[in-house]
Amino acid sequence: MRTAQQFYKELGADGLALRKKPEHTRLELKYLKKILKKKQKILDLACGYGRFTIPLAKGGYDIEGLDLSPNLLKKAKNDAKRSKIPIKFIEGNMTKLPYNEKSFDAIICMWSAFIELTKEEDQIKALKEMLRVLNERGFAFIEIPAPQKVFRNLKTKRKDVKSQKIRGRVVQSIIDGVLANPMYLHNKKTMEKLMKKVKPRRFKISIEEFGGRPRTLVWMWK
């Protein structure tokens, strides 16, 4: 099966950036600034090219980023250097985070990064890793597509995105002619089931407008 590294290497940082409308990013950043505090130690998990890491750091937030794609991290580091902002970027996998216990007060995991883990056991590992590196009373905020949005894409006639199911709840798309890595389709019920297996102190799952479009928002507190 195609890996995330292969997809992002082929799509490239610039190609990925073109997939996100500036207005979406602006609204999402505004939301993040409301839920995060500058005194917190924050991890941007699956940070990509630093779409949120860099502007949050510019705004005075204590944040660092982790991603599994070397080419996306290269752009993030170069952009941060150009902006003269010291940000720590690390290559790594969310199923085995290279951090000590209780390293962060908050974790954000944006776009569709979490559901690129197509096996439930890997998703459980990632959630447990988030809890491990969070401080007591810390939280993780995960954003994934709303189920109705994904199923609509399965029927879309858009020329830039074509999606199809490949097994169970896993979908694969072709984006701008590039075969994307598969994604696991979660709805509110399946996400709740996953959380009950991980057993955080508290969690909340909602489907609401985020960045000007319907998204599934997942909160998890240690």
Task: List each language-model region with its residue ranges.
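Conserved class I S-adenosyl-L-methionine
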Residues: M1-K37, K39-G48, R51
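A short SAM/SAH-binding and catalytic strip from SAM-dependent methyltransferases
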Residues: A106-E121
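A short glycine-rich, Lys/Arg-flanked "PGG" loop and its adjoining helix->strand segment in the class I
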Residues: I124-E136
